[in-house]
């Protein structure tokens, strides 16, 4: 490749170890569009009541689901998931967790934009929560201890949102309605976006 970039520190480190080349860390492509751009692709979901969106790698952890059930009762809001596997759905019913009828990226973004509280366990869940200015929390799972997976940690640090990272055990001990001040976050995202466009323009111009 004539040009190469990565979005995380580990990727930069591994490429340097393998090739001796230090590549730049550039924003994920999803950050190159503004919230206004993304909102043109979706529509507000027609859920009349306030609700919590839970977006995770998997939904089969009974301990986590028990906590989420208590969260739903505490805030008097149902919890919705999207794209849950069919064999998980019957297990989620007993916790009062609902499966949204739509799926895919557009369904997820539409649901996220409408949610009152967003609980995520993914890099892109954090990205879109920040772009849409959501009251969100990034969940760390004690079961997953992959130190090489730094995606969530890095994007939280890049945007100044480190305090939004919590464990499932914290969900009942803090006020999940705590708003996020997105003033500085927006500045940081715009700086990341500008750096990315500058890099893209450099290789398009053949520099």
Q: Locations of the language-model features?
A:
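Active-site anion-handling motifs in enzyme catalytic cores
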Residues: 1-207
């Amino acid at each position: 490749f004539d040009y190469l970039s990565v979005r995380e520190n580990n990727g930069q480190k591994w490429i340097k170890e393998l090739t001796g080349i230090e590549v730049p860390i550039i924003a994920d492509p999803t950050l190159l569009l503004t919230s206004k751009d993304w909102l043109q692709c979706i529509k507000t979901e027609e859920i009349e009541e306030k609700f919590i969106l839970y977006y995770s790698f998997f939904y089969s952890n009974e301990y986590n689901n028990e906590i989420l059930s208590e969260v739903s009762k505490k805030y008097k809001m149902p919890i919705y998931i999207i794209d849950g596997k069919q064999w998980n759905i019957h297990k989620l019913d007993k916790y009062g967790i609902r499966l949204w009828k739509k799926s895919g990226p557009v369904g997820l973004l539409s649901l996220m934009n409408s949610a009152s509280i967003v609980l995520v366990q993914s890099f892109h869940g954090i990205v879109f929560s920040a772009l849409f200015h959501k009251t969100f929390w990034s969940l760390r799972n004690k079961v997953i201890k992959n130190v090489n997976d730094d995606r969530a940690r890095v994007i939280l640090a890049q945007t100044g949102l480190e305090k939004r990272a919590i464990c499932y055990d914290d969900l009942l001990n803090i006020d999940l309605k705590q708003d996020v001040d997105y003033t500085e976050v927006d500045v940081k995202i715009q700086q990341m976006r500008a750096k990315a466009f500058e890099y893209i323009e450099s290789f398009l111009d053949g520099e």
